[in-house]
UniProtKB/Swiss-Prot annotation:
TPR repeat coordinates: 14-47, 48-81, 83-115, 116-148, 150-183, 199-234, 236-268, 269-301, 303-335, 344-379, 380-412, 414-446, 505-538
InterPro entries: TPR-like_helical_dom_sf, TPR_rpt
PROSITE patterns associated with the record: TPR (PS50005), TPR_REGION (PS50293)
Signal peptide, first to last residue: none
Keywords attached to this entry: Repeat, TPR repeat
Annotated protein name in UniProt: TPR repeat-containing protein MJ1428
SMART domains xrefs: TPR (SM00028)
UniProt KW Repeat keyword: yes
Length: 567
């Protein structure tokens, strides 16, 4: 058989070999096509098409050196053939000879309108940092008649991200999904939509905070649940749900919610709240661990220091407590609201007075309680003011403050009891008796009634009760963070970047930009935006394998510190 085949091959003409080679080429049987073209060229080597077809078959066999030799032969015979130049450009591209590839492909593109050609020119432009040119080629590739080159459109979308044009990138990716719903850009589009929904939720979150302040806790819960329906990863909504559960003394539920916040965003603020809740659940060790974790994540977290100060105060470890009250007073609190700053300073100054025995701290605390009363005519703040006067031995002003508290909340038992103690110490025994009698009419508890009856018996016998008003440090209101809009955006900027999502980070940074006025910070924002543009492009290249650049994370952290934002 081999002998017969050899004889048969010798009898074949040039035309026979070309016909057979063309057949194999059309069928994609490139190795056979190469054999036949070589046989044909042995008989006649002056037809440039044969050399071109040989080069084309070798190209598909990834034998690029031989392919280059063949296409050079074709070009020697027909140097102006644009299709030969096109193939030569492709071969150089595969050989990694990018400059030569660009030269021939660019020349070919003047007459050949081919989606693959334009896409490769786009890829080469990207390699040399000519992104505007690359975008032009990718869009040309996609917009070719009957083109379905979604890959080119995806690359165009990535360049839009590199330019920071989120809207055009979103439109490009959406166009891809209309034609291929399972395309890899689906994750990117979902990310963009989720971030926009989260940003739009700020007004709802702010309304929820207002409701908490106004003690409309059920209304606030509804708001935060609404936000979670829109953005299931709204860590701040779980934080506020934890706060509401803590206010209702449902500490296990509060712990569940704060753990959910932490699972979404490993944030110092949330560990401080977890410490508060664990302490109220009786887990002192767990609370201390949570507070220390909060401090490790952010050494400027006043809530963590305050939680530790209160914990050690109640344990009777006054030196430790005093040191942590110092930490609160030393911490720069720019991000916090005026109300939160005043409350933390107020209780910390009282704490310093009671852990050191220095009355001057009470005097310093007075200006903060006055500020809080000006912000909100609350019975709590009038009560604390009365307590401070009491500790300073000023029973007259303590009496006036407690009376002001009762004008806001006439049936508050703690205030009535403290008022009675002040009246007794002022020598106004009959008024003290009248006050205790009023308490009996309000409270319907056998144990409490017996306690008051014993007090009344002593007073009527003109015997001292030796009662003291308990420290306000044993009745601290639930503390929680109330971020302004800039810090809300900033914390989410950090969250998204820390969670390897530079697109979400970029969108939040764009919103922060509109609230920045200082030139120094504006320059930093512009620098971060530029780096995030590159990170977005890199994210689209890697998707699931993407990891945020540590240097960008550190720069974002520095920006947050300059903005006074607490993580």
């Amino acid at each position: 058989m081999n002998l017969f085949r050899k004889i048969s091959e010798k009898l074949k003409s040039y035309e026979d070999w070309v016909t057979e080679a063309n057949y194999y080429l059309d069928e994609g049987i490139y190795d056979k096509a190469v054999e036949c073209y070589l046989k044909a060229l042995e008989k006649k080597n002056t037809n440039p098409i044969d050399w071109f077809n040989l080069a084309y078959a070798l190209y598909h066999l990834e034998k690029y050196d031989s392919a280059l030799e063949a296409i050079n032969e074709a070009l020697k015979i027909s140097p102006s053939n644009i299709y030969f130049a096109y193939l030569k450009g492709l071969i150089h591209y595969k050989r990694g000879e990018i400059i030569l590839a660009y030269k021939y492909l660019k020349k070919a593109s003047e007459k050949i309108k081919n989606e693959e050609l334009f896409e490769i020119l786009g890829d080469i432009s990207v390699k040399y940092g000519r992104y505007e040119e690359a975008l032009k080629y990718y869009l040309k590739s996609y917009k070719m008649a009957n083109s379905k080159n979604l890959n080119a459109l995806f690359k165009a979308g990535k360049i839009y991200l590199l330019f920071g044009d989120i809207d055009k990138a979103y439109d490009a990716f959406n166009e891809i999904l209309q034609q291929n719903p399972s395309h890899e850009c689906k994750k990117i589009v979902e990310c963009m939509e989720n971030v926009v929904n989260a940003i739009n939720s700020y007004e709802d979150l702010n309304n929820g905070l207002t409701m908490i302040k106004n003690k409309d806790y059920i209304g606030a819960l509804k708001i935060f649940n609404k936000v979670l329906q829109i953005d299931e990863n709204s860590d701040i909504s779980y934080y506020y749900k934890s706060v509401i559960a803590e206010i209702f003394e449902e500490y296990k539920k509060a712990l569940e919610y704060i753990d959910k916040s932490i699972s979404i965003f490993n944030r110092s603020l949330y560990y401080a709240k977890k410490g508060d809740i664990l302490y109220k659940l009786g887990d002192e060790e767990g609370a201390i661990e949570a507070y220390n974790k909060a401090i490790k994540l952010n050494s400027q977290n006043p809530y963590a220091y305050f939680g530790l100060a209160i914990l050690y105060y109640r344990k009777g470890e006054l030196e430790k407590s005093s040191n942590f009250f110092d930490k609160v007073l030393e911490t720069y609190l720019e991000e916090l609201s005026e109300e939160d700053i005043s409350a933390l300073n107020l209780y910390s100054l009282i704490g310093k007075a009671e852990t050191t025995g220095i009355p001057k701290y009470y005097h310093e605390a007075m200006k903060y309680v006055d500020n809080l009363i000006n912000l909100e005519n609350s019975s709590r703040w009038w009560y604390v003011k009365g307590y401070i006067y009491y500790k300073l031995g000023n029973y007259k002003d303590a009496y006036e403050s407690f009376m002001n508290a009762l004008r806001v909340n006439p049936k508050d038992i703690s205030t009535l009891k403290s008022l009675a103690i002040v009246l007794e110490k002022s020598g106004k025994i009959d008024e003290a008796i009248t006050t205790y009698t009023k308490i009996l009419k309000i409270v319907n508890s056998l144990q409490f009634t017996c306690e008051i009856d014993n007090i009344l018996e002593k007073l009527r016998s003109r015997k001292p009760t030796n009662l003291e008003i308990p420290s306000v440090l044993f009745d601290i209101p639930v503390m929680y963070h109330k971020p302004n809009i800039t810090c809300f955006y900033a914390s989410n900027l950090w969250k998204y970047m820390a969670n390897n999502n530079p697109i979400g980070a970029y969108i939040y940074l764009s919103f922060i930009e509109s609230y920045i006025s200082l030139d120094e910070i504006s320059q930093m924002v512009n620098d971060i935006k530029s780096k995030l543009s590159l990170e977005m492009y890199r994210y689209c290249e890697l998707i699931d394998d993407y990891k945020s650049d540590e240097s960008v994370l550190m720069q974002i952290k520095e920006l947050l510190q300059k903005l006074g934002c607490m993580l």
